[in-house]
């Protein structure tokens, strides 16, 4: 819609001046919901009002007419804005905040009584640019990302920033890993070129990851423009000042800085030079695996029951965010992993220190986000007080270390606590200037201590003791005139005045007494002193608020000068919180320090699933631990056994142990020896993907295909029931070929759970594959799941027993047992007519051997396969050939 069409639609020419102002601003922000400040309310008009009233559940009313058209209107109180913004941001709306830039009095002085108050948009709030504490999750980052695809389309550059903490990063990502990297970061908003709107990438980001995409015109990412933006922002002459970065990284960084400038109206906090991330320095965990393992959220997207929720006993918000980042990005460098483990071990060996530090950390605040609000002029006195309390607690924490160790601390601990020495100058500045009861709103006044500035003290004295000052002046005039009955009074017409009776008028001789009014019984005067006092009393509140704002701004500028130190302090405190947390959970839940190797070891003794164990503990139940011994020579465990026996839990727990170990934490086991895992892939369970029109089987095959394409020798794969979403013959064939491919081609560690007992024969000719099963105890028709993993293969699935446990009617269970008995007779050559009367879906290995069966054809086909020579594409084509035999 062009400007002319817009004005015509809203009858611009006959609108009031105020409504014309609104329409001018709205046209400049058509993609936003515009909140227009009108006195004590933010109001919305026309379509915005209709939309907002529905989303926010507030009344829709009218604001007169514009021509013949009624103007829809709704509004929210300015002091409750954050509550309503929360709902709008949750619904992914882009919100433009339009504020009054002058008071009505200033507008009147500028342009007369008909002048419209000057207004303009002061910021645009989007999901990726929030800094308000009440609008963002405290225990996780709030990333805005910009994604730029390289010209060869083999890699992408990703810049991501957390505006609330002023952190910015840039990374190059292989094309096949883009979705996995986005899944790691979980950005609230992604900037993408308009040219990619109809691409498969954009479709996957929206449908698979459900992330918000904000499209920008292609020129928004232009290299020359973005380079200039970077140089201007960081006041550099050469882009090399950023480091060794690619053209696409320049575009990603520049576009994100430009977007921040547009949404924050140039009011961007000082961001450090982007930290260049090596993609391969973190374990790759694809989005499906993150969902399956429930690492930072459960399958419903909430915290309860997730690994993060189980491990998170941090006591600070910034510590919680750091733990979130650790779990999202496990390390792959042995030296860095061991460095973290050594820190954890130090605190585990000093639990008394841990206890004291955790209590002191509770007295600190989220100074990262406080500092950002200060630099963006959106802070309150509470933010400064938070910094003060944190500085005080930090010095005490450092004292705890030196009380215990003196100057004999390990270097890696000394490095962490170095910033805890504090900053006496900064502490004293805040302590001497900011009142302990400072309000949240600067306009309320009362933020600066009276003694910090003499003028503040004077103005507050006037506000608090105005009557005493008037009384003092009255006493002075009584003494000067000799009129004991002299009074100082007030009315709304002439304000303060000196009131004497008519008979005493001859005693007023001093010309400083200026006649104002004569009544029947009295004469009224004023003086220059009284007029000055009256003016000061009338303006004291306004003057003190104005002065306090000036002083507050100066104090904030002095705090900003210490920004680098405060960020180091925040990093130190969050690190202490996380490693004390690791020590705490190691002691609380009996975790052990893992050992890392550079081979394919995965030797876990008495491993446990931390989330399940914690849940059982609440019910006073014990978790059944299990060993897992993978190595170069025994890379694949093929696990058979019934449902409910614990196969999936066993698979998940070992993947989780690898993740926990590589973030630098102790692990739930008696011992753990692990060769570093570069990638973890999990295919456990699937639901029909109705949004993308994919069945369970298609979803499973897509996930399995991605695993086979992206895994390396150092990866860990956990697969559960591959092939179960199709017929028995297809399923066994697919599972068989997948196992062969992992064994012969990938040669990586793998836990493979299945109901296809026919696969267990593969251990006869795949030397690195071993059979394991779940121990069962039978008593008549009853079975007991022991949950122990033991060497060997299951001889049957116990499906009917599980059905009985699930509560199926007894008649159904009895009938199922009768049919099973007939099937079992069929497989031994008896009851030959059962196939036609009961089922045609028997196991392919149980059909009659004296006929030319599908099984024999499959056997013949398998004998001609050369697994080492098959590409993934050829393997998939082979699957379709096998299907034709059915």
From Swiss-Prot:
Molecular function (Gene Ontology), one example: ATP-dependent DNA damage sensor activity
Gene3D superfamilies recorded: 1.10.1420.10, 6.10.140.430, DNA repair protein MutS, domain I, MutS, connector domain, P-loop containing nucleotide triphosphate hydrolases
InterPro entries in UniProt: DNA_mismatch_repair_MutS (IPR005748), DNA_mismatch_repair_MutS-lik_N (IPR007695), DNA_mismatch_repair_MutS/MSH (IPR017261), DNA_mismatch_repair_MutS_C (IPR000432), DNA_mismatch_repair_MutS_clamp (IPR007861), DNA_mismatch_repair_MutS_core (IPR007696), DNA_mismatch_repair_MutS_N (IPR016151), DNA_mismatch_repair_MutS_sf (IPR036187)
SMART domains, per database record: MUTSac, MUTSd
DNA-binding found in the keyword field: yes
GO biological process, alphabetically ordered: mismatch repair
Tagged with keyword Coiled coil: no
Residues annotated as binding ATP: 641-648
Annotated S-S bridges: none
UniProt keywords, alphabetically: ATP-binding, DNA damage, DNA repair, DNA-binding, Nucleotide-binding
Annotated family: Belongs to the DNA mismatch repair MutS family.
Function: This protein is involved in the repair of mismatches in DNA. It is possible that it carries out the mismatch recognition step. This protein has a weak ATPase activity.
PANTHER family recorded: DNA MISMATCH REPAIR PROTEIN MSH1, MITOCHONDRIAL, DNA MISMATCH REPAIR PROTEIN MUTS FAMILY MEMBER
Name of protein: DNA mismatch repair protein MutS
Organism: Rickettsia felis (strain ATCC VR-1525 / URRWXCal2) (Rickettsia azadi)
Encoding gene, per UniProt annotation: mutS
